[in-house]
Amino acid sequence: MKFAVIVFPGSNCDADMYHAVKDALGEEVDYLWHTETSVEGYDAILLPGGFSYGDYLRSGSIARFSPIMEDVIRAANEGVPVLGVCNGFQVLLEAGLLPGAMLRNEKLTFICKPVELEVQNNDTFFTSEYEQGETITIPVAHGEGNYYCDDETLKQLEANNQVVFRYTDRVNGSRNHIAGIVNKAGNVLGMMPHPERAVEQLVGGEDGLRLFKSILRNWRESHVVTP
């Protein structure tokens, strides 16, 4: 399986994402600079955290118009798995691949710590290695992670089981404690916590590694060649 890590000016979690795939998961991965125009040939696309374009205007709003994003959107609409973490989640929101928006954390402070998440839906491309209702520990590091959407959108997200991860505590003010959501097709996941920072016991745990293992497992199952 071949992964692409999209690198924007100001990305600072791209190396962590690369390490998670190459060293922890053991799969092939390339960096793709934001000026590239094609993601053809990649089986999964990863948008890392950071401060793309300095977070000017608002987080993710400029990165959304990078040349590479047109093809990321095309690939997502064709079913290619796309994972956006932290700033990557914000870019997915700005690109319209996921509903809603991000606000400043309710206490207007930058939050950087491990948090507990409850797995709300383990029947997705990204969560099949988890147990339904399981509590996992994944670090967060953000100042604008307060997920917001209108009441109707929230109702649809909950009804369609699109809420994948939920904070077990009030971390940043997100509606319904939402930490991560998928699109209706289930192939695009945005989440504020950083699974790529939880792939080794050496740095605090491996709860994030199972997300990448889920991607690999489901890709392999969908590419089984039968005689």
Swiss-Prot record:
Instruction: Write out the catalytic residues in the record.
Output: 86, 194, 196
The record's GO molecular-function terms, alphabetically, read:
ATP binding; glutaminase activity; phosphoribosylformylglycinamidine synthase activity
Which parts of the sequence belong to the Glutamine amidotransferase type-1 domain? 3-225
Instruction: Kindly give the InterPro entries that the UniProt entry links to this protein.
Output: Class_I_gatase-like, PRibForGlyAmidine_synth_PurQ
Pathway it belongs to? Purine metabolism; IMP biosynthesis via de novo pathway; 5-amino-1-(5-phospho-D-ribosyl)imidazole from N(2)-formyl-N(1)-(5-phospho-D-ribosyl)glycinamide: step 1/2
> Where in the cell is the protein located?
Cytoplasm
Location, primary (coarse class) = cytoplasm
Any GO BP: 'de novo' IMP biosynthetic process
Its recorded reaction(s) are: N(2)-formyl-N(1)-(5-phospho-beta-D-ribosyl)glycinamide + L-glutamine + ATP + H2O = 2-formamido-N(1)-(5-O-phospho-beta-D-ribosyl)acetamidine + L-glutamate + ADP + phosphate + H(+); L-glutamine + H2O = L-glutamate + NH4(+)
Q: What SUPFAM superfamilies does the record point to?
A: Class I glutamine amidotransferase-like
State whether keyword Repeat applies: no
Question: Keywords of this protein's UniProt record, alphabetized?
Answer: ATP-binding, Cytoplasm, Glutamine amidotransferase, Hydrolase, Ligase, Nucleotide-binding, Purine biosynthesis
Quaternary structure (record)? Part of the FGAM synthase complex composed of 1 PurL, 1 PurQ and 2 PurS subunits.
Q: Report the protein's function.
A: Part of the phosphoribosylformylglycinamidine synthase complex involved in the purines biosynthetic pathway. Catalyzes the ATP-dependent conversion of formylglycinamide ribonucleotide (FGAR) and glutamine to yield formylglycinamidine ribonucleotide (FGAM) and glutamate. The FGAM synthase complex is composed of three subunits. PurQ produces an ammonia molecule by converting glutamine to glutamate. PurL transfers the ammonia molecule to FGAR to form FGAM in an ATP-dependent manner.
**What protein does this entry describe?**
Phosphoribosylformylglycinamidine synthase subunit PurQ
